[in-house]
């Protein structure tokens, strides 16, 4: 590797809004604030909801004559 052309790789702390603190390394060089992390994201916590907004699936199926699977 060439000397002097690579950015410094520093230890940073990523803090989530839920209070979870993650220590990692980054070239950013300053602490990071996160909105969501693996501890509070709905997909990982199992609290994810599938929202059918305004019957769009039924509208699509009726438009293309796809029989309902229910």
Curated annotation (Swiss-Prot):
It comes from the Bacteria. The keyword rRNA-binding applies. Its cofactor is Zn(2+). GO terms for molecular function: metal ion binding; rRNA binding; structural constituent of ribosome. Belongs to the bacterial ribosomal protein bL31 family. Type A subfamily. Part of the 50S ribosomal subunit. This is Large ribosomal subunit protein bL31.
């Amino acid at each position: 590797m060439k000397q002097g052309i690579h950015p410094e790789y520093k230890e940073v702390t990523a803090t989530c809004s839920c209070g979870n603190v993650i220590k990692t390394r980054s070239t950013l060089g300053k602490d990071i604030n996160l909105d969501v992390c693996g501890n509070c994201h709905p997909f990982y916590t199992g609290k994810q909801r599938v929202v059918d907004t305004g019957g769009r699936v039924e509208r699509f199926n009726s438009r293309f004559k796809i029989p309902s699977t229910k």
